[in-house]
Amino acid sequence: IYGHMFRKFGEVDEYKPYFNYNGDYIPERSSHTFVKGFDQIAWLLNEIKVNPNSSRLILSNWDPKVSTKTPKEAVLPCCLTLLQFHVEELSESERKRWLDANYEGGGLKAIVDYCDTGVDVEDEYRKEEIQEHGFGNLLNHYSVPKAKLSSQLYQRSSDCTVAGGWNITQMCLLTHLIAQQSDLAVGDFVWTTGDIH
């Protein structure tokens, strides 16, 4: 249900068959209602690119129509209610740590590889370039993210023994995927629940 809510929030696809008083099905009096849903993931990815400092970077799973239906009509209302994202710039030292953790051989090897022109690792021009630009060219050369993506989950209800760990894992993975698609490093994940049992 979470994937459907993230990609097709509010979508309605209902067919109401019409039967006359004898119980005969009458197709021409039946009705079909379709309302296209809203793709929250596509919207979020675009919003991160055009407005990364927005406080509205939110995915919502809560649909009041679902929670008011009788148990026979509805599936269980979503436990993962709201996921909010926050983009924060990385300092140069944080970018260096990211390079060190993510470049095979570490950040020092990345510096040596970047400076190595094939002639001499001690090439003065390359050393001066790195010093002059404060590692900026080096970090950009290796596509080191300039910002990180953090997220906070508000979970309406959490059954820890059945799904709690799985729910947290799902949303952490989703945060990683969105960060990857947005060329961002991964920041913090904060979890809040209203009812834990």
Question: Model-predicted segments: where are they?
Answer:
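Terminal, non-catalytic protein-protein interaction segments that mediate quaternary/complex assembly
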Residues: 1-197
